[in-house]
Amino acid sequence: GDAPYIKVPDTLKAMQQIAAYYRKKMSLPIIGVTGSVGKTTTREMIAHVLRGKYKVFETIGNQNSQVGVPLTLDHLSSNDEIGVLEMGMSEPGQITILGEIIHPNMGVVTNVGVSHIEMMGSRDNICREKLDIQNGLPEDGSLLLNGDNDMIRKHLSYVKKPYEFYGFAPDCAYRAENIREENGQTHFTFCYNSQREDMVLNVLGEHNVSNALAAIAIGLKYDVPMDAVKQQLSTFSGQRQNIINTNGYTVIDDSYNASPDSMKASLKILSDFHADGRRIAVLSDMLELGPDAPSYH
């Protein structure tokens, strides 16, 4: 046809450069979220909490790749006040590239597991790749890290930006205590400095409490009032976990993706769930685990 076009040597690079240019024109703060597992739910929770105060732009679906992030940024508008973008990777160097496109003001690293270990070679390599989210941060940028992850703790000397921990460990700045499940909801006490707040989540599992801690931390950093944070968290449902009651059976559908860490988290929900009868786990295989796949299974 007669449509104008621009001829480029590399269409992917061109798309990324256009997206980076577009992002630079927008002054809104953006929070980048990465991690082997938990990044989508954490990103959704952060966005939900921030909606207690702002008009929020967030990743569309799971468009967190080298192609997906530029496509997502295409939908950014001048009405948006704050952004929460997911940053995925399957090969070395990809998080740095996404950081150059997004230029996040803050980076969140949820977890370092074994997803994509086939391409990355080791958990150490995966960890350093995830921590490369710091490369795209501005001078005054900072990190929020999962303080319960062994790999993140191991590689702290690699971190060149100010950081805070969230999690269950005693030295985490944003902490949860007294976690319990009641009537299909998760209750916990949020601890920050000398502050103590009772929180209610509509999703199950300790891993979701961890995700919620990241969301609360970001909410407080961006001045969302605590009452609004509580209200937003209590109405969060997320895309990942559906609980269906039918004919006396309870089905917990947590089937979006499978890695050893997410599988363990789902099995813990199943074992903690109050049931009068049998508990049945329906599991698929887990991909991209390399030569250690049998032992992970």
PLM regions: where:
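Acidic, Mg2+-coordinating active-site environments of NTP-dependent enzymes
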Residues: G1-A3, V108-T250, D276-G277
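A general structural signal for well-ordered alpha-helical segments in protein cores
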Residues: M15-A19, R43, Q66, I95, ...
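Phosphate-binding loop of NTP-binding sites
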Residues: K13-L143, G147, M151-V159
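Buried hydrophobic packing segments
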Residues: M15-I18, I46, L50, T72-L73, ...
